[in-house]
Amino acid sequence: MTLTDDTTTAQNSRHGDPIEVARELTRKWQTTVVERDKAGGSATEEREDLRASGLLSVTVPRHLGGWGADWPTALEVVREIAKVDGSLGHLFGYHLSTPAVIDLWGSPEQKERLLRQLAENNWWTGNASSENNSHILDWKVTATPADDGGYFFNGIKHFSSGAKGSDLLLVFGVIPEGFPQQGAIVAAAIPTTREGVQPNDDWQALGMRRTDSGTTEFHNVAVRPDEVLGKPNAILEAFLASGRGSLFGPIVQLVFSSVYLGIARGALETAREYTRTQARPWTPAGVTQAVEDPYTIRSYGEFGIQLQAADAAAREAAQLLQAAWDKGDALTSQERGELMVQISGVKAIATQAALDVTSRIFEVIGARGTHPKYGFDRFWRNIRTHTLHDPVSYKIAEVGNYVLNQRYPIPGFTS
């Protein structure tokens, strides 16, 4: 299929239900997910499936060529994808953060141009923000001012999910010493193919094996003035203002929660099928089928209750996020704070439920279910890996600080 064919197919599909489009894709991926997870590497074919589906522009407004879907719908798509393939759910969820950043921090011209191009060309986006230094905001990648008002980026980013194979890259750097505004953060959206950008094939981890979350190097990468999102430190100013521009943290945390809940739901449904068709009852149970074992039934009840509660909380938070998004510049710091408290709670519940379900499904499938051919371990490995992104204890503390002291979470990249 040519790029033109991909574009036409994607544009034609944007009049349907994006959730059903996601389900159709996952039915295709279901039969190969275990083998693909074992192999690791890049999810090139599956990413092209997503490109051709048109889902990459699910949150782009319709007048700019996208689906125009709301956040509850987009997050449901994340859950559907993650339910079958955690790595793809991870990649797609991270992809959604870039159109959001462009909308939140870009100029009107940048929003019009970049979001339209994203929709018309079915761009994948990647990110290059995290670094492996003394703390999470100890950034060493430099953004050296250029004479034309742009910058030259130099350094190495880590955990660059989706950078490899992407078309547009969201990157952050700091102005080095010796220049006005030294230490200020510069954000930019640049073509991944720009000279000097080098996404590396060096990602290794317990889980999320096919997310290409390795390093990305920047060798004197030229960033044009019209690719810079806002002025230096505009991001921190947006966080301090605690208005619409600070919604990046809530969006990312709810995306993460949706990935977790999708993976957990996938683990539950896959284990249920195994229990129904292959598991054996324990002799003292006095039953002939595993599905009649009272302890197995109880375990599934516990799994279902946890996910029922977490799903309900996540969907409520998604509605609140959409309401905050729609308020635009009228969003108050109080409304933003209340939203983040809700999402912090969702993140905590989703993390706990997903870790419990993905580790305990082995109790209801039995020893034979641990054979590598079934791949049940992938659910827990993916959850355990990604839930280490930012400590859930701090999300619980954010809720606790609000309940006890009526203090809202401090706006930032993760809150």
Swiss-Prot record:
Keywords annotated in UniProt: Cytoplasm, Flavoprotein, FMN, Monooxygenase, Nucleotide-binding, Oxidoreductase
Enzyme nomenclature, EC number: 1.14.14.21
Entry binding sites for FMN: 94, 127-132, 157-161, 280, 365-366, 387
Gene Ontology CC terms, in alphabetical order: cytoplasm
Pathway where this protein functions: Sulfur metabolism; dibenzothiophene degradation
GO biological process: dibenzothiophene catabolic process; L-leucine catabolic process
Oligomeric and partner information: Homotetramer.
Domain notes: The lid loop assumes one of 2 conformations allowing opening and closing of the active site.
NCBIfam families assigned: DibenthMonoxDszC (NF043015)
Name of the protein described by the UniProt record: Dibenzothiophene monooxygenase
